[in-house]
Amino acid sequence: MITTKELRNKFINYFESKNHSHQPSSSLIPFGDDTLLFTNAGMVQFKDVFLGIEKKDFSRAVTVQKCLRAGGKHNDLDNVGYTARHHTFFEMLGNFSFGDYFKKEAISFAWEFLTKEIKLPVEKLWVTIYASDDEAFDVWHKHIGLAKERIIRIDSSDNFWSMGDTGPCGPCTEIFYDHGEDVAGGLPGTPEQDGDRYIEIWNIVFMQYNRHADGSTTDLPKPSVDTGMGLERISAVLQNVHSNYEIDLFQALIKKAQQVTHAKDINSPSLKVIADHIRACAFLIADGVLPANEGRGYVLRRIIRRAIRHGNKVGAKEIFFYKLVAELVSQMGEAYSQLIDKRELIEKTLIKEEKLFLKTIENGIKIFDAEIENLKDNTISGEVAFKLYDTYGFPFDLTADMAREKGLKVDEQAFLAQMQIQKQRSKEAGKFNVDYNSLINSQVKSEFRGYSTLIEDAKVLEIYQDDQLVASTSEQVSAVVVLDKTPFYAESGGQVGDKGILEGVGFEFVVEDVQKSGEAILHIGKLVKGRLNLNDELTARVSDKPRLATAANHSATHLLHKALKLVLGGHAEQKGSLVDEDRLRFDFTHDKAISRSEIEQIELLVNQQIRANYPVTTIEISQQKAKSLGAEALFGEKYGDIVRVISMGDFSIELCGGTHVAYTGDIGLFKVTSEGSIASGVRRIEAVTADKAIRHTFTNENKIIAIKDSLKANDINLIDKIKSMLEQIKNQEKQIAKLKKELLSGSSNDIKETNIGDIKVVVANVDGVDVKTLRNKIDDYKSKNTKVIAVLTTTNADKVQFVIGVSNALTTLIKAGDIAKELSSHIDGKGGGRADMAQGGGNNSANIDQALSQVEKFILNNIKE
């Protein structure tokens, strides 16, 4: 039996023998592609190559690509564990041609690999082609020798692939394996095609057309090939098993899952879920994703939590999920060394997330059970599902799973509507919303000269105004200018674009930002003088002060990155950065706040390298060579075959395309200005360098001097004086709280209480107290009365604050939240809360007595009903 590991290697070796360049799998996070949540196909890393935006030094490639389908349009999560072939994470075997070979060679390679290399019986194989693709038919029939009846024409989108509404597209041919008569299902194109007998094992896409906005197509000058074959699926065929979960790799993970969960039934779908999900979670964490409440981090969190619940379902009594990492590393670490490198981070992340979830899941299940007891039909509302998500961290699919087990369904549309309301929070927008890739001619190329000069004579290649290509632009008009060569650095790798001027005879163009599209460098700004025309000769001048300040900050991030690893540990990986002339911002993985002592160590390390005045050296070498030298490749970046390596003495070596100082001493001084959390497991440091670091130090010193002057203190007794003052404040606050309580108690005689049968109703305004005091009084009423409704307000100038309490025994008659809404309507306010407790405030205290009178009527009307 051929193992999954052997099959993976056999595929690579075969295509390398056919002059294909073996390219490593790209990250599960598609860099620079906002259209995808995760990499879900082998062609994703080559998308810009197919579009003609990016050039490679090879025309044939072979990959084994990590893929994930668990979010967005491509989402297999709900089916995982319940079918034979659905997965969140999977490996896609692929061979690619970029304007090299086409249909004859692509089909021949696939057929030879299947029938000669891995020896699949020819009689077990069937193929489909696009209905009108006679060329593919001829290759299969005349060249390969496949019988006509085994070639099925399909006239549907199943056999025609496109990258989008516009762009490269073309017909497909698919190869199917027949599992035999004992398995239900019919041939592709028949009504029974959805059965499991005939399984697609290889899809070959022929990108030969370019689809235009009007729907028409034209031939591509260089047709290409994109193929994909699921490793798990072809492994199942070769290992003579029907389900992907029966292959060697999954069986090892399933056995481990049974061991750590103490499950009794090895065939439980829950064990398949766990075995699948550990792969997805481990690879996501290794690629830099950490659990969060939105975006990719939320997808990871929901996968982790789904696995945990399935573990609990089959008997797990303690945290278990992280215990599968060792087995996963054993199975896949040889092919993916990142699993070995990131093992500690993966295990720590899973342990932390599982502990966090176990703290909340019990409460969430109680809420779920309480809600379904009151159901009037078999549908759980979207509002309840959202409450479970928002308050208890339950992913929607977890709620749906729990509902399905009880024969119920969830209103997903209403849940999504609630999610959409929540998402209306403002988010940081980019500076530009123009799709420059579609705007700029893909053949245009700008040569960047800015590493060695800030001034360059250049020629105007293209001008864009209002998203349109124009021959010239006039004064005071915003435009985008493309030059044949430029010293301007385009925003990339966290470093902002340069600013400066393009000037020529009779014109001046102020460059406000610089972006890149393919190989074109875009100078974005405004013509402030004269007229600018195509082919004009000009001088491009980068503003030197911002560039030099930015370079100092960028070099400092490299030193900071290494210092973080030395002080905090190797897990401190870069998650993002922003470098401009004023500051640097650096995001990295770490699961707790950095102590003052650690910050001091980090600053000391960085400043030691600055004082050492190491030369900052640059070399361009192959990516393979750079990695062998130990160069840090940063998360999310997309690197070419030849990479630029920046070294600072023996301290730091990183792949980087940004601009840097000549010597570390040029940074001057490094000072951390802030440190904090931006997401679960992700911290952010902000810092300044050079003159700004000195000014920051002066500012802090001046603040300390001002504090000493105010407290009449000196360097020796300042801390003691501050501690003494804080202790005095604390004692005074206790005294104030005591006086407020006494004030409220003294006012109790003036508070009107109404008894309606055995229900006590209290509605009153009490001045001179705070909300905490009101809340304590409400709790006091509720503890001393089994049936009480209490509404207490306090006013300060025109502001009103209120607290409302309703005994649990009365919440079926009236809810505190409803009373809050009624009161808010009379005081220009808002408020809300639970059925038994609510609070809020308003901006109109003038009519507080009238408002309370209306609220009392509202209460009495409700309880009398």
From Swiss-Prot:
A Gene Ontology molecular function term for this protein is:
ATP binding
Q: What EC number(s) are associated with this protein in UniProt?
A: 6.1.1.7
Q: Which reaction does it catalyse?
A: tRNA(Ala) + L-alanine + ATP = L-alanyl-tRNA(Ala) + AMP + diphosphate
Family matches, as PROSITE patterns = AA_TRNA_LIGASE_II_ALA
Q: Does the keyword Cell inner membrane apply?
A: no
Required co-factor(s) are: Zn(2+)
What residue ranges are annotated as transmembrane? none
| Subcellular location as annotated | Cytoplasm
Please state the protein's primary subcellular location: cytoplasm
Domain writeup: Consists of three domains; the N-terminal catalytic domain, the editing domain and the C-terminal C-Ala domain. The editing domain removes incorrectly charged amino acids, while the C-Ala domain, along with tRNA(Ala), serves as a bridge to cooperatively bring together the editing and aminoacylation centers thus stimulating deacylation of misacylated tRNAs.
Q: Which NCBIfam families match?
A: alaS (TIGR00344)
What name appears for this protein in its UniProt entry? Alanine--tRNA ligase
- What is the native source organism of this protein? Francisella tularensis subsp. mediasiatica (strain FSC147)
The gene that this protein is the product of is alaS
